[in-house]
Every structure is written in structure tokens, then in C-alpha cells.
């Protein structure tokens, strides 16, 4: 491809509204352009990368025995009413009516549509198991789209759905998808980690996420230092306390804390050890009888909202209570709350349950209790795992300790069970002629998100460093002052022709530009290999080659260059 015939819209300056590196570089490299909040057009370089990601995903899905279909982006609301998600899904589900006042949604996911297809098309156990997938645009009306295509409203996704009569074939397909996802990310040259995950709003039992490792990742991954255990921090089980509750050595008393609104201020101003403090958080309850619930973790621990949401007494999805609600119910603000005399249901983390002589808010503004002890000063509360794990703690697998990594989720696989098939009456006749509700699996890959994640993992201060498998072009040709030298022009044209004839994807910079601009653009867009042609090269019978990732430079004889680039990784 000649740059003169190509839309290479690079920018020198970093856009002010781009928060993360991938968003900045995708804009600067001319890969995408914003049309509206969370909506982007893909320009030629971006689309070339997107199509390469899509091709690898498609190949590995086909290799795993899945069959491609295509479902509509617009879905009838009736299907969502059947599963109950019409009411459960929040405002991220874009709803609209056609000219006949019929309700529709712009699909954020396709469980309802695929289940409707299967219940109409599959009637016998002989047609199972079946694994169908599509690569389709999705839309989720995110409250705050950000990070470019990392969290956009419209995005490209591969979603697959499998149907089974028994758990054995469900497990087999799940493992096949696990392997396929590992192959997909491995072929793209990305460092990644599969992790145990929460099933979230889609529901189901078994679930794994696939994370591209990057320091900028939003997700925290807990892993064992001595086994292959890895889990999203939302899912990782905190270890049980190894020491029993200590005996009381203090009497409970009230202290004035007018300027201590946070745990840190309480510790700093009053000399209390942070491990002797607790955080009391008020969340929305699941019942009218208990509209508010108190959940408590130790002062140096972080509340795990996903774990809290799984408590029967807590409203799902998780929602913090507002200050006005809290004051109306408890008589004090969030910085002065504690379990002593609490009139709403109380759940404490295992680590809080073994505390003694601890400090907490007194449910009066500007006052705290110190020397609190369970059973003496307040009744035993409900106990559960409510916190995030901490680096260095024993791993839940029993081997090694917990380490923490940051990752970007690009894939998620679920065993859904009968959540959707039961709601929609998707069943088949088994060998005995008896109707059996189908087991379902669900497997998603964020195709457009992988592009951004790859950049987050592969860049430097000059631009993108594409892994070869998904680079927009394999090699760039940079002829120095080609328009002033027939020798350079002729050699560049011949090299372009030879490489193209060999099936190599080439970007030939034939612009009338200064060499500095050409070099900067080539490094910004991140092609793995660059060939420079100047007068000295022609005199010496060699091309100057540069590897984008390593920065290594070599002189390659004219006659060897095609084979060299073909074999370059």
C-alpha cells in the first residue's frame, strides 16, 4: 500500500480528552476517530488491525468446532420480557419503539435471540451438542464511556453459545473454548492470564475471564506464587483468620472525634492502630423489612462489592445507601457509624469477627467507641467473606501466597446452566422421548477491545509496537528524499514490488515529506519492521533494516531482503 493512496491521518500532539495510552495512540496513529460519546469510526490502519484480530478469532472458533451465524443487532423486547431481563437490565439497555409502537432493544448481548432460535430449530438430542457463534456489533449505553474503544458504547464482539443435554458435553465444550481463547491470545503475541471469575449479571455457575496483562488494567488479578491458581480479585476467597478472637482487655468508652471523618484521620489523630479499626458501609437491602444493611470490614481492608452483592439480604445490583437515607435511619453520617446499637441487619467479615478491643463509630456525629468487644458490648453479627484479598496472604489453593497483577478483560466464558433455556422453554426430547431443558454455555471475546489492550501492553514513548500477527502491515519502506533521486525511487519501487509479490503486507511511504516526519509516523503506527533506502545504501548494495520492538539495526544485502522479511517475526 502506498501512503499517497492511503488515509494516514497521524497527529503529533496527544489529544487532551484521551485518558489512557491506547486511546491516545489510536487517535494519534489515525486508527479511529470519535463521532460521539462512546462511538468511533475505524480508519484504514485501525480497521486492518481489527480485521486481523477478527480473523484469528474466527479461525480458532472454527478449529474448536463452533459454527458461525449472524443474528440481528435489533432485538424484539418480547424475548427480554420472557427471561425477565427487560426489567432487570439497567439503563445501559437501549430501548426504542418502531413506527408500530412495538418495543425493541439494541442488543448488548444475544442470549435471548440464540435461545429463541434453538427452541425453534432443535428438537432432538441427536442434534446436540451444538456451539454457534457470531462476530457482531453490540451496544451498551454506558453511563460514562471512556478510554476510547476500551469502554465504548458500540463495540465489536464475538459471542458464542453452546447447547447441551448433559454436563459432560457442557464441560467438554467449555474446555474447548478455554483452549480456543488461550490460542487466540497466544497467536496474537499477547501476555495474558485466564482467571476464575464471577458470573455477574449473565448468571450461571463456572466462569473464567481472560485478561491481557497491562499495568494500566482496570482489573486486579490475584494469583498464587506456587500454582496455576488465578482469579479476579472479585472472586478470590480471602483466607480465614488463623488466630482466635482475643480476650477483652479494655472497657468500652466514647471519645470525641470531630475531625475524624475517615479511618486514616481516626488513626492519625487518635493513635489507634489501623488493624483495631473497622469500616461500616451501609448498602441497599433486598427487602422492604430491611431496606438498609450494614457491612463491615477491618480498617485496613477493602470491601468486595461482588461478595457483598451475593448476600441474600443485599439488593442486587450492589448499591450504596445515600447520606440522607443513612442519617434518617441511623442518626449519623457515614464517617461516624458502627455496629454498637445498630438497628439494621449487620454482616461482618471473618477478620472483623475475631477482633477485640476495637474502635468504631458511635452512630453519633463526631464520636467513636473504643474498646469494643463482641458479645459483651454487642451481639454476634452474621459473618461472611466480604473483603478483597491482600498481596502476601496465603493463596486459596493452599500453595504459595497471593500476588497481584493488573489486567484488561478481553474474554469471558460461562457455564450458564438452564437460566435462559428454562425461562424460554428451550428443551429437546432425549433418548427416552422425554423433554429435557437444555444446558447452555456462553463465550464472549471483545474483538475491538483486544486492539486497545494490545496497545496498552505494547508501546513505548514513540508509539505503538504491534505484535506481528495483528500489525496493520508487516513492513514499512522509507526511501530518503525519493523525489530528488531516481536511484532511490527506482530501488524503492522495485523493493515494494518484490515484497508485495512475495505476499508481504507493505506500507510504502512515497510522500514528499521530510525524513524526520516519515520516521516519526512509522514508529507511531508501530509496524514491526522498517527498511530505509538512501544513496549510501545503494552504493553499498544493502538496505538498512530496523526492528521496531528491539530497536536493532542491520544492513541486509539487496538479494537477501525478501527472504529476511518473510522469516522475520
Swiss-Prot record:
Keywords, alphabetical: Aminoacyl-tRNA synthetase, ATP-binding, Cytoplasm, Ligase, Nucleotide-binding, Protein biosynthesis
GO biological process: prolyl-tRNA aminoacylation
Top-level EC class as recorded in UniProt: ligase
Any single Pfam family the record assigns to this protein: tRNA_edit
Main location: cytoplasm
Domain of life the protein comes from: Bacteria
An MF annotation (GO) of this entry: ATP binding
GO cellular component: cytosol
UniProt xrefs under InterPro entries: aa-tRNA-synt_IIb, aa-tRNA-synth_II, aa-tRNA-synth_II/BPL/LPL, Anticodon-bd, Anticodon-bd_dom_sf, Pro-tRNA-ligase_IIa, Pro-tRNA-synth_IIa_bac-type, Pro-tRNA-Synthase_IIa_type1
Subcellular localization: Cytoplasm
Catalysis: reaction(s): tRNA(Pro) + L-proline + ATP = L-prolyl-tRNA(Pro) + AMP + diphosphate
E.C. number(s) listed in UniProt: 6.1.1.15
Family per similarity comment: Belongs to the class-II aminoacyl-tRNA synthetase family. ProS type 1 subfamily.
Function: Catalyzes the attachment of proline to tRNA(Pro) in a two-step reaction: proline is first activated by ATP to form Pro-AMP and then transferred to the acceptor end of tRNA(Pro). As ProRS can inadvertently accommodate and process non-cognate amino acids such as alanine and cysteine, to avoid such errors it has two additional distinct editing activities against alanine. One activity is designated as 'pretransfer' editing and involves the tRNA(Pro)-independent hydrolysis of activated Ala-AMP.
Complex formation: Homodimer.
Domains: entry comment: Consists of three domains: the N-terminal catalytic domain, the editing domain and the C-terminal anticodon-binding domain.
Protein name per Swiss-Prot or TrEMBL: Proline--tRNA ligase
Gene: proS
